[in-house]
UniProtKB/Swiss-Prot annotation:
Keywords: Dioxygenase, Iron, Metal-binding, Oxidoreductase. It comes from Chaetomium globosum (strain ATCC 6205 / CBS 148.51 / DSM 1962 / NBRC 6347 / NRRL 1970). Trans-resveratrol binds at residues 125, 158, 401. Piceatannol binds at residues 125, 158, 401. The gene is rco1. This is Resveratrol cleavage oxygenase 1.
Length: 594
């Protein structure tokens, strides 16, 4: 009798020439994107009373939310990428020293269309020219990048489309969220920032001017106040159609990081990638006022080619200059978006065999002299660019990503930040684990700015200083190594009630690469090296997620009351009208009789 593995190997492939030709039976591609920790999970359900090692701190009462791209169906293209998976939200509810797990897919328009068809219908990542004709005009977002609690709802976000609202307790999808009809752009960031002092949410969108797939250079920035009312909106032009994944906010300014990974409409129409890395293009930083802005108020700063990671902190000095901290890698992090064939990298860049991702500090003067230029992508629009190029004022060799801070200190000088860290000097069991899916994030790091690098409200200096400068350190480092068979996903800081900055806990998902399962680990945020105080064991393998947040349950409970039928605000109002680009497309179809 043949062994089951022999039978499986003899099955006819579902893909011919990279294209899905046989939707059933369900079989996913045999590629690294769908292997190891990235094998599809597709779990929906609840698991109560999870096994725990150690002691969950008694003062933790809330939910750790995170989201993962998780293809519901085998993709249309065999070489599909991780970022194209359907958003699945995980909620780990913690109370009274116990933990429970709930997970559900975000019921986006895309998800619902494919669920009814019983197969994938949407093609390459952010490329509608590769979709099945039956879904033309459907919002393509998979809502798989971040989940943010806002005014009683959980917003599942991906920067290629509008957010979708979910119930924070049941994870039921309520519908597309347009801020009660106030924001109707085709795209919306996955990284809004909330000002803890004012309660305002500052948010933005790129490729915002058309249908979200036309490679426009339009950038919009909005502010929504704590009462849910849009109070600021301004539109700008970027120098080229590229990715603006994250931002920072200070008390008076917004900083947008434009990465030299470029869109090209003709490439997309040929069935190619949405993005291509351009090793000859600068990295750019756009600085705009938070209040009363006009389109010409933007100032773009240029620096040498590099790839932006995520923002740690952003604040202002007494001089009015802006401090902006984020990780910046020295090459293309998104290897699945290589340069176009006609692009020749500068000498040295093509020979890099590994990337470094330090934490860099930039200081921008919003009053710097600037000039209007014209670019090929912006066409006849003015792009306001600083006359002088910029360089980081310091580079801390953390080699990490997914920076997080105590968000009570958003817009303010901050002392502490945390990252998932790559340390290639630590042992790794390749025989047991294979290639580390998602990157070798084998450590968690806690970093504390010291000396002049921590700016108090009275600081007047902006130079780089502090112990350890000679070896690329600008403060204290507290690092925990996972072991030779494990890696971490993004950490999240949980503040201790009434505690000083950085006092609290750090929570993260731990990947057991040799066992293909996950744990949730909880640390004392200022003593990572001592190891976790509690480990919550999950009885299944999740996927590599992207971002998440902790929400205190007092906030959820209070908003549930306000959002009830007899509450002072009432139930969440989800979008009732199609987006403007959808209306326009419907009109065009009517005119042509399609």
């Amino acid at each position: 009798m043949a062994h089951i593995h022999d039978l499986a190997a003899s099955l006819a492939p579902n893909y011919t020439a990279n294209r899905l030709t046989t939707p059933t039976p369900t079989r996913f591609p045999r590629t690294p994107t769908f292997a190891s920790m990235n094998k599809p999970c597709r779990f929906e359900g609840t698991v109560d009373d999870l096994e725990v090692t150690g002691t969950i701190p008694a003062d933790l009462d809330g939910t750790f939310f995170r989201v993962q791209p998780d293809h519901r169906f085998p993709p249309l293209f065999e070489d599909d990428i991780h970022f194209n998976g359907d958003g699945a939200v995980t909620a780990v509810r913690i109370e009274n020293g116990r933990a429970a797990l709930r997970q559900r897919y975000v019921r986006t328009d895309r998800f619902e269309k494919e669920a009814r068809a019983g197969r994938s219908l949407f093609g390459r990542y952010r490329n509608p020219w590769t979709d099945n004709e039956s879904v033309k005009g459907v919002i393509r977002t998979a809502s798989n990048t971040n989940v943010v609690f806002w005014r009683g709802v959980l917003l599942a976000m991906k920067e290629d489309g509008p957010p979708f609202a979910m119930d924070p307790v049941t994870l039921e999808t309520l519908g597309r969220y347009d801020f009660e009809g106030q924001i109707v752009s085709p795209t919306f960031t996955a990284h809004p920032k909330v000002d803890p002092r004012t309660g305002e949410m500052v948010c933005f969108a790129y490729e915002a001017g058309g249908d979200g797939s036309d490679c426009s250079v339009d950038v919009a920035v909005w502010t929504v106040n704590g009462d849910g009312r849009k109070v600021e909106e301004c539109w700008y032009k970027a120098p080229f159609a590229g990715m603006i994944h994250d931002c920072g906010i200070s008390e008076n300014w917004v900083v947008l990081a434009l990465t030299p990974i470029k869109m090209n409409l003709e490439r997309m129409k040929r069935g190619g990638n949405k993005f291509a890395w351009d090793p000859n293009e600068d990295q750019w930083y756009g600085v705009v006022p938070r209040r009363g802005a006009k389109s010409e108020d933007i100032i773009w700063f240029r620096a040498d080619n590099a790839f932006h990671g995520h923002v740690a902190g952003c604040y202002e000095l007494p001089s009015g200059e802006i401090v902006f901290d984020l990780t910046v890698a020295d090459g293309n992090v998104f290897f699945f978006f290589p340069p176009d064939d006609n692009i020749t990298p500068p000498d040295g860049i093509a020979k890099r065999n590994k990337l470094s991702s330090p934490t860099t500090r930039w200081i921008f003067d919003p009053k710097a002299k600037k000039s209007a230029i014209r670019t090929l992508d912006a066409r006849d629009a003015d792009v306001w660019v600083a006359d002088e190029r910029v360089k980081p004022t310091l580079t801390w060799l953390t080699n990490g990503e997914f920076s997080r801070i105590d968000e009570r200190y958003n817009t303010k000088p901050y002392r502490h930040f945390w990252q998932a860290v790559v340390d290639p000097t630590k042992p790794y069991d390749f025989a047991a684990c294979g290639p580390p899916a998602g990157g070798l994030f084998n450590c968690l790091g806690h970093y504390t700015w010291s000396g002049k690098n921590y700016h108090t409200g009275e600081s007047t200096e902006n130079g780089a200083s502090g112990e350890g400068e000679g070896d690329g350190k600008f403060g204290l480092e507290d690092v925990y190594f996972s072991g030779p068979t494990m890696t971490f996903q993004e950490p999240t800081f949980i503040p201790r009630e009434g505690g000083a900055e950085g006092e609290g806990y750090l929570i993260a998902l731990l990947n057991h690469l040799d066992q293909l399962r996950n744990d949730v680990v909880i640390f004392d945020a200022q003593n990572l090296a001592k190891g976790p105080v509690a480990v919550i064991h999950l009885p299944l393998k999740l996927k590599l997620g992207l971002h998440g947040n902790w929400v205190d349950h007092r906030d959820i409970d209070a908003w549930q009351k306000r959002r009830s039928e007899d509450g002072d605000i009432g139930p969440v109002q989800v979008a009732k009208e199609p987006l403007p680009w959808q209306k326009k497309l419907a009109e065009q179809k009517g005119e042509t009789g399609l």
